[in-house]
Amino acid sequence: MAFTLEDMTEEEFEAFRGMSVQNFAKQNITSGTWTEKEAFEKSEQAYENMIPNGRDSSNHYFWNITNDQGERMGWLWLYADPLHPQKEAFIYSFGLYEAFRGKGLAQLALQTLDERARELGAERLALHVFAHNETAVYLYQKMGYAMTNIRMRKQLC
């Protein structure tokens, strides 16, 4: 099965951004980083800081993952700065819609991303994944990603 990465339209980007802000808030609540009260506001602010010009923010790429039947399978947000000293691109967000999960398609989509990142001048890819997202951690390790940092927390009260 072949995949393509197609630029999101402005409307698709706005829907993606809304979903992403909500998801980032939820992930930070689950990880214990933010409280429910502050999570949405902090998530919204983080997105404003990362992509102040929305879809047109410099060196940010927002793609729909599409299969060879033209079905939208998921999304991908990549930051690739050609001037990065280590030629490292960063995956801010990647996911498949529910109907396409659990079929090995994420691996194929990530291979498509590898090719596109190389075309953009990247020599390596980095990402952040929340530790509680064990499925994603396993996928990324299987695809050759290695842990570079581990942040730990101990609850005292």
Swiss-Prot record:
InterPro entries: Acyl_CoA_acyltransferase, GNAT_dom, N-acetyltransferase_domain. Keywords: Acyltransferase, Transferase. GO terms for molecular function: acyltransferase activity, transferring groups other than amino-acyl groups. Residues 3-157 form the N-acetyltransferase domain. CDD domains: NAT_SF. Its EC number is 2.3.1.-. Pfam families: Acetyltransf_1. Belongs to the acetyltransferase family. This is Uncharacterized N-acetyltransferase YdgE. It comes from Bacillus subtilis (strain 168). The lineage of its organism: Bacteria, Bacillati, Bacillota, Bacilli, Bacillales.
